[in-house]
């Protein structure tokens, strides 16, 4: 087990992958296989909200996310402590997270009053002051009306794997709504991306201020070409919808479908690429007439 120096359990993102590690003796291998299996990945995702947006509701001022799931963190703590007591590793383990990137998007109107404060925290601080405070100035406040934006945090140290006042110590993200008025609707959504590693050797890192990048909302009408704009207008005015059989029409008078180029919801508006499609109403009759077979 002495060859364990670092483990990469997962990345917290919408494309979360777990890298299996085959290290140490047979007992350690069994434990690691269990911790990094596909079944474990599902547990990580469920407990940490990996790959999912966190909804910020008006009636819930505070939200917290641990950057390592509780069950997985406890297993790592137990494994490293056991190997440390045997003299196989130089420490009982630390959690290393180089950086955390958060994407915030507004789900309320642009004149919504209030702001969001986001903090990178170390859960040990809750045992001292009953309040999760930002570590090393890793805190940023943004007005709801200024969204969308991206925020980056970076801790200056590795978090020790240990229990403090009966709670597992871990890095986490806290979001706090300020001055938001409402009865429970979602005012914004947050998606966090990060990479977690477990190491036996701790480190310290240069202190940097939180970085924020505001994103200009997409102006559909300004960015579309004349052809795309024409298709867009036809689409929203229902001129391109196929309503199927019309009352009073005969089988010989049914008009053929017309393909209209419209803005593709999955294509990049900047590239000018659009997809050719025909819209239809669910449940409407199909107007296509089968061609007669030649004998």
Swiss-Prot record:
Region annotation Disordered: where it falls in the sequence: 256-295
Compartments where located: Host cell junction, Host plasmodesma
UniProt KW Hydrolase keyword: no
Entry GO CC: host cell plasmodesma
Ranges of Polar residues composition bias in the record: 266-281
Lineage: superkingdom: Viruses
Gene Ontology biological process terms from the UniProt entry: transport of virus in host, cell to cell
UniProt KW keywords: Host cell junction, Transport, Viral movement protein
Function of the molecule: Transports viral genome to neighboring plant cells directly through plasmosdesmata, without any budding. The movement protein allows efficient cell to cell propagation, by bypassing the host cell wall barrier. Acts by forming a tubular structure at the host plasmodesmata, enlarging it enough to allow free passage of virion capsids.
Family statement drawn from the similarity comment of this UniProt entry: Belongs to the bromovirus movement protein family.
Name listed for the protein in its UniProt record: Movement protein
Organism: Broad bean mottle virus
């Amino acid at each position: 087990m002495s060859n364990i120096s670092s483990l990469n359990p997962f990345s917290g993102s919408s494309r979360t992958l777990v890298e299996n590690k085959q290290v140490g003796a047979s007992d350690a291998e069994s434990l690691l296989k269990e911790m990094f299996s596909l079944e474990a990945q599902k547990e990580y995702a469920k407990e940490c909200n990996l790959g999912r947006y966190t909804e910020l509701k008006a009636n819930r001022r505070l939200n917290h996310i641990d950057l390592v799931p509780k069950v997985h963190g406890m297993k790592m703590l137990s494994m490293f402590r056991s190997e440390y007591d045997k003299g196989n590793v130089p420490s009982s383990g630390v959690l290393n997270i180089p950086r955390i990137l958060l994407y915030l998007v507004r789900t309320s109107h642009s004149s919504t009053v209030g702001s969001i404060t986001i903090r990178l925290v170390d859960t040990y601080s809750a045992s001292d002051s009953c309040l999760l405070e930002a570590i090393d100035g890793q805190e940023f406040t943004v007005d709801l009306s200024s969204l969308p934006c991206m925020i980056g945090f970076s801790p200056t140290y590795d978090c020790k794997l240990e229990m403090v006042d009966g709670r597992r110590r871990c890095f986490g993200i806290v979001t706090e709504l300020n001055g938001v008025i409402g009865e429970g609707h979602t005012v914004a959504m947050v998606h966090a991306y990060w990479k977690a590693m477990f190491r036996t050797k701790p480190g310290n890192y240069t202190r940097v201020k939180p970085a924020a990048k505001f994103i200009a909302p997409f102006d559909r009408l300004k960015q579309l070409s004349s052809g795309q704009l024409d298709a867009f207008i036809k689409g929203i005015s229902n001129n391109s919808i196929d309503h199927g059989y019309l009352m009073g029409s005969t089988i010989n008078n049914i008009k053929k479908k017309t393909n209209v180029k419209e803005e593709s919801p999955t294509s990049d508006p900047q590239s000018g690429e659009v997809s050719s499609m025909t819209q239809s109403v669910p449940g409407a009759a199909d107007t296509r007439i089968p061609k007669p077979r030649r004998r």
